[in-house]
Amino acid sequence: MFQNELQSRIEDLKQQIAAFPPGSITKKKINGKDYFYRRWTEDKKRKEKYIPMTEVETVRQQIEQRRLLEQELKTLKVQLSKSQPEKEIVTSPAFVTNVRTGKSLRVFSASVQKMRKRECYQQLYNFVYGEAQDKVFILYGLRRTGKTTMIRQIFAEMDDNELEKTVFIQITLKDTLADVNHDLKLLEAQGIRYVFLDEVTLMEDFIEGAALFSDVFAACGMKIVLSGTDSLGFLFTEDEQLYDRCILLHTTWIPYREFEEVLGIHGIDEYIRYGGTMSLGGVHYNETSTFATLESTDQYVDTAIARNIQHSLRCYQYENHFQHLRDLYDKNELTSAINRVVEDINHRFTLEVLTQDFKSHDLGTSASNLRRDRKNPTDILDRVDVAEVTDNLRKLLEIRNKKEQQVELDDVHAAEIEEYLNLLDLTQKIDVMHLPNVGIKTQRTVIAQPGLRYAQADALIRSLLLDEIFNSLSLPERNAIQERILNEIKGRMLEDIVLLETKMANPGKQVFVLQFPIGEFDMVVFDPNDAACQIFEIKHSAEVVKYQYRHLIDQEKCAQTEHRYGSITKKTVLYRGENQMVEGIWYQNVEEYLKNL
């Protein structure tokens, strides 16, 4: 490994290590009950902190991960010292926090120079190089959505003079606002102009004292960028401390267009399976996907979402903002409850697919396609009662959901947790309208990170099919049914992806599902200003089948729609095939549609 590569990897490791807690876990028995504590040494003093029972295993894994990273760091430092023994990296003793400046930032940014930039990068760039605004820039979002990478890309574009006026401060669990204030005063005296603070929400007192950044340092001409994964904490900070003195940029939502352009990955199925983070992409970002396995998916939900919410509530208004969730927090069940709500949303989605999406004509089409398959023709779906299997799966899922409810959640708990998930941009609501009964309005809950939903649904179906109730099915039969169900899940997820991205791209229009007593339009885009609408069917298929657009040419459905939503200007089937016109219906490739939004 070359010297600059060693230095770059060392800087990466330091950043990763800072995000994990130091120390070890110890157990104490008090009044016959086991209590767990994290113990570590800081400033030559031993410290310890209580760990709720539900968090012990996660903290244990984090400590082990830190230990492995520290071992790698130690090895690389030895290699670096051998390759350049006369040069030593010295941290200024004047600083309390981990401050990097000047040439070290060039090394820190070296590995991202060839990475493609996210679309929101330009907003960060404009703030850094635009006129001073007496505001701070907040770059926030869930883990692995490109926040720190964008900051490093800013460093990569700076010349040497600009880098000398720039610092990057990596906040750790031990840092406080007083520590940062101390260092910022020193940096201000040195003429530093650009300050980037990463993971600022790790500071326990950040939410209550964040006005320091805008009122003192930004007002004196510093350009300050705050970043971190604790999205909810930043929203609380804006409401409590910063008000109109901050610019917010949220990185959590990654549309298909960016998934393809930034990561260089093509295909809607890849987006369905892995979309939602910047951690899949070969040479561009990390090697493996966050949602490649159920274990990594569950860990992401636990650390990036559940603990995000709990940490923010604990640090906000001196723990006075838990509302009805206080009892769960006091019983150390809040993290588990949040995990459960996310899982419930995805299990309900899977249940809907099993209940609603398995129509006889679809099963017949699948069986026919398998029989005519050129490579591996089979009549396996003719020999299996898929409808009965599906019904058994649905019943089994309902039973499992009840058994797994270890934490009792009432409607108030679930509603409050879902509100926080909405604030994190993890979930979005899509309206479902009804005709001719216009008084009925329901909603779909869409997960903005499709890979998370698919991973949980996929694991659920695979585990259900292993139940003894399906012992009579051979392995090939189970695999065929599994593939069939997963294709249905992909089809429904494709609908949700198109609905969400169309809604986000058209804030001045209404985007919804329109249901009739029999059948529905998968998507309607209604423009109230033009008194007109477009109607869509969304299919996971790459084939053109007349049955797909039967609702679009239904005169009664179209007449009811035009009476309520104005003239229908276009009828479209979005699918995975080539663009073409079929009997007045525009068949458009869904990937092309999403990229052009």
What is the role of each PLM region?
Residues 85-128:
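N-terminal pre-Walker A segment at the start of P-loop NTPase domains
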Residues 147-148:
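Conserved lysine of the Walker
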Residues 188-210:
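Conserved P-loop NTPase "ATPase switch" module shared by AAA+ and STAND
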Residues 216-238:
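Sensor-1/coupling segment of RecA-like P-loop NTPase cores
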Residues 236-379:
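Interdomain motor-coupling "hinge/lid" segment immediately C-terminal to the ATP-binding subdomain
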Residues 502, 521-546:
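Conserved catalytic cores of phosphodiester-cleaving nucleases, focusing on short active-site segments
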